[in-house]
């Protein structure tokens, strides 16, 4: 298997198997469009510490089947917020790294990793009050008490009872 060179935003070079790099649809499409590339591929939106984590995920999932198309079973899996044990441990990082992984997987077009990151965030807010969510993500409350009450009334139907 041939090797691909990737350059992170902070100019660190990563040499990876093409199979692993092609978990990224961005890279896979680029290679299909231009053929074999003998120069490093710059990834200006991904720092080395984040790219290292993303490549670790790609290495672990290199043999997973992923067609890039949404089928009925894929849609059912996306609706679930269940995450397998390895991915749950992989995503057990600080919030900044978690969000950087989500952004990188979106940029690199690695849908299964993006889904896993989004499910992780969804699980972080499941069952929490708006106040708890604000604390978790350091979000200031910019609503007046009157605005909050109005929003609660308008969304009463969505409350768990």
UniProtKB/Swiss-Prot annotation:
InterPro entries recorded: SKP1 (IPR016897), SKP1-like (IPR001232), SKP1-like_dim_sf (IPR036296), SKP1/BTB/POZ_sf (IPR011333), Skp1_comp_dimer (IPR016072), Skp1_comp_POZ (IPR016073)
Cellular location(s):
Cytoplasm; Nucleus
Q: What's the protein called, per UniProt?
A: Suppressor of kinetochore protein 1
Region (Interaction with the F-box domain of F-box proteins) residue spans: 102-161
Question: Subunit info?
Answer: Essential component of the E3 ubiquitin ligase Skp1-Cullin-1-F-box (SCF) complex. Interacts with cul1, fbh1, mcs2, pip1, pof1, pof2, pof3, pof4, pof5, pof6, pof7, pof8, pof9, pof10, pof11, pof12, pof13, pof14, pop1, pop2 and tfb3. Forms a complex with pof6 and sip1. Component of the RAVE complex composed of rav1, rav2 and skp1.
What results from changing residue 102 to A?
Causes G2 delay
Give one Pfam hit by family name. Answer: Skp1
The opening ranks of the lineage are: Eukaryota, Fungi, Dikarya, Ascomycota, Taphrinomycotina
**Gene3D superfamilies reported for this sequence:** Potassium Channel Kv1.1, Chain A (3.30.710.10)
Instruction: Tell me which UniProt keywords the record has, alphabetically.
Output: Cell cycle, Cell division, Cytoplasm, DNA damage, Mitosis, Nucleus, Ubl conjugation pathway
Q: What does this protein do?
A: Required for cig2 degradation in the G2 and M phases of the cell cycle. Together with pof6, essential for septum processing and cell separation. Involved in mitotic progression, essential for the execution of anaphase B; required for coordinated structural alterations of mitotic spindles and segregation of nuclear membrane structures at anaphase. Involved in the DNA damage checkpoint pathway and maintenance of genome integrity. Component of the RAVE complex which is required for stable assembly of the vacuolar ATPase complex V-ATPase.
GO cellular component terms, semicolon-separated: cytoplasm; cytosol; nuclear SCF ubiquitin ligase complex; nucleus; RAVE complex; single-stranded DNA-dependent ATP-dependent DNA helicase complex
GO function term, MF aspect, one: cullin family protein binding
Q: Which residues form a coiled coil?
A: none
Family that this chain belongs to = Belongs to the SKP1 family.
